[in-house]
């Protein structure tokens, strides 16, 4: 079904049915009552929806074998990043595409006492 080998489609369908049941167990709030009562019902409904979404993500993550949190990508310090367009940058839509240039020393843009 989803291009996986080893997992049965029946297990995936059971998982999807379970998630569908969770969402169906929380119908939208009624439109009756005072403004404050409606607001409270909507607030509680949205909170339940958030809980159902969280539970559904955990169920699918467990079934599909995914990590709960994405692995953070290590980035170099921002102080060492610079945009360097001294080389041929190109003008046909590829401008700004490429790997960032990392300098050992960050250059001083305006030295003390210099004027533009």
UniProtKB/Swiss-Prot annotation:
Composition-biased stretches (Basic residues): 36-47
Gene Ontology molecular function: DNA-binding transcription factor activity; RNA binding
Q: Which GO terms describe its cellular component?
A: host cell cytoplasm; host cell nucleolus
One Pfam family name is: REV
Q: How is it modified after translation?
A: Asymmetrically arginine dimethylated at one site by host PRMT6. Methylation impairs the RNA-binding activity and export of viral RNA from the nucleus to the cytoplasm.
Q: Which GO terms describe its biological process?
A: mRNA transport; viral process
Phosphoserine PTM positions read 5, 8, 92, 99
Q: Keyword Transport on this protein?
A: yes
Q: Where does this chain mainly localize?
A: host cell
What are the subcellular locations of this protein?
Answer: Host nucleus, Host nucleolus; Host cytoplasm
Region annotation (Homomultimerization) ranges: 18-26
Intervals of motif Nuclear localization signal and RNA-binding (RRE): 34-50
Q: Where is this motif: Nuclear export signal and binding to XPO1?
A: 73-84
Q: Which residues form a coiled coil?
A: none
Region: Disordered; residue ranges are: 25-49, 92-116
This protein's domain notes? The RNA-binding motif binds to the RRE, a 240 bp stem-and-loop structure present in incompletely spliced viral pre-mRNAs. This region also contains the NLS which mediates nuclear localization via KPNB1 binding and, when the N-terminal sequence is present, nucleolar targeting. These overlapping functions prevent Rev bound to RRE from undesirable return to the nucleus. When Rev binds the RRE, the NLS becomes masked while the NES remains accessible. The leucine-rich NES mediates binding to human XPO1.
Q: Can you state the subunit structure given in the record?
A: Homomultimer; when bound to the RRE. Multimeric assembly is essential for activity and may involve XPO1. Binds to human KPNB1, XPO1, TNPO1, RANBP5 and IPO7. Interacts with the viral Integrase. Interacts with human KHDRBS1. Interacts with human NAP1; this interaction decreases Rev multimerization and stimulates its activity. Interacts with human DEAD-box helicases DDX3 and DDX24; these interactions may serve for viral RNA export to the cytoplasm and packaging, respectively.
User: Misc remark for this entry?
Assistant: HIV-1 lineages are divided in three main groups, M (for Major), O (for Outlier), and N (for New, or Non-M, Non-O). The vast majority of strains found worldwide belong to the group M. Group O seems to be endemic to and largely confined to Cameroon and neighboring countries in West Central Africa, where these viruses represent a small minority of HIV-1 strains. The group N is represented by a limited number of isolates from Cameroonian persons. The group M is further subdivided in 9 clades or subtypes (A to D, F to H, J and K).
**What is this protein identified as?**
Protein Rev
Which species expresses this protein natively?
Answer: Human immunodeficiency virus type 1 group M subtype B (strain 89.6)
What gene does the UniProt entry assign to this protein? rev
């Amino acid at each position: 079904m989803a291009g996986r080998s080893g997992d049965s489609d029946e297990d995936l369908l059971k998982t999807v049915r379970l998630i569908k049941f969770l969402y169906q167990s929380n119908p939208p709030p009624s439109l009756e009552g005072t403004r404050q009562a409606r607001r409270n019902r909507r607030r509680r409904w949205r909170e339940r929806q958030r809980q159902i979404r969280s539970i559904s993500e955990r169920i699918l993550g467990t079934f599909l074998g995914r990590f709960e949190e994405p692995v953070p990508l290590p980035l170099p310090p921002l102080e060492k990043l610079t945009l360097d367009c001294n080389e041929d940058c190109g003008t046909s839509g590829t401008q700004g595409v490429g790997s960032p240039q990392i300098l050992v020393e960050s250059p001083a843009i305006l030295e003390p006492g210099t004027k533009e």
